[in-house]
Amino acid sequence: MPSTSTLPVGQPCWAELPTPDLGSTQDFYRSVLGWDFETRRDDKGAEYTVATLFGETVAGLRAHDGQVRDWTLYLAVADLARSAHQVRRFGGSVLEEPQVLPGLGAKVLIDDPSGATVGLCQPARDWSFTVGLPGSLVWAELVTPRPTLADRFFGALFGYEQQQIADGTRVDHVIWYVEGESVLARVRMNLDSAEPVPPRWIAHFAIDPDVGFDETLERARAAGARLRFKPYGSSIGKVVVLSDPLGTRFALIDPSQVVNEYDSPPEDPYDD
């Protein structure tokens, strides 16, 4: 991972799951991704659980009394106060007062104008977050029914370069780039869903190639995961979208199985 001083603005720098049942959530992700866990305290003295993999920090879990929430992705900023001001200026909402977590930095939750929640983080000097390895975060996609709003907001906030990789009509799938490197994607939600579905970020975690895609999927289902959409090929690897036993959606991905998903008529992997 890049150092704090060189981490590009707009780059994912943390992933956090608020959960109403910390114990069962730990059990599930331990069995599927091999995570271990340790407890820290934030600047207000509240306990905070950090997930590790072979000693490397890969995610955070936070006890939350309330309904099940999605994985929260945090994006790096250079100045949290200035970025929060820009969020409001560009049509978003700041949802809370900033918090400081040792080993991470100052962070705050926002809603973009399309209604999806995401975090901003000004990394601390001792910031540590491992991505791109088996069992860790390797990709994330914003799924929203209001794609133009999302593109404009995040483009203004982070200066993302944006490229449409689908036909833009039947399937609208845009990749966001930082300094020429693809970092995130935005997907238009299926507009024909029978019921309204809120916009959400889908965190993608890499499978262990020594275990394999199919075996990891079976482990997830045996541990209580629900299949949300059958496995599909993509330009970033073979993907399956699941929900954990409490209902939080996430994806497993095998980056070694890359295909051009738009060589044939595409299916919407987020069709609810």
Summary of predicted features, one role per range:
Residues P2-V9, E16-E56, R89, E97-G105, ...:
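Core segments of cupin and vicinal oxygen chelate
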Residues L53, A59-D65, L73, V77, ...:
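DNA polymerase sliding clamps and clamp-related checkpoint/processivity subunits
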Residues T25-D27, L61, A84-H85, A150, ...:
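Short acidic, gly/pro-rich beta-turn/loop elements at beta-sheet edges
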Residues W35-V68, P113-A124, Q164-P199, D208, ...:
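Conserved short beta-strand elements that form part of the metal-binding/catalytic scaffold
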Residues V68-A76, R125-P134, F154, S193-H204, ...:
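Short, surface-exposed, charge-dense and proline/glycine-enriched linear segments
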Residues F28-V32, D65-G66, E96, F158-E161, ...:
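Short low-complexity stretches enriched in small and charged residues
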Residues M1-L7, Q11-P20, V50, A63-Q86, F90-E141, Q164-S182, L217-D272, ...:
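Vicinal oxygen chelate
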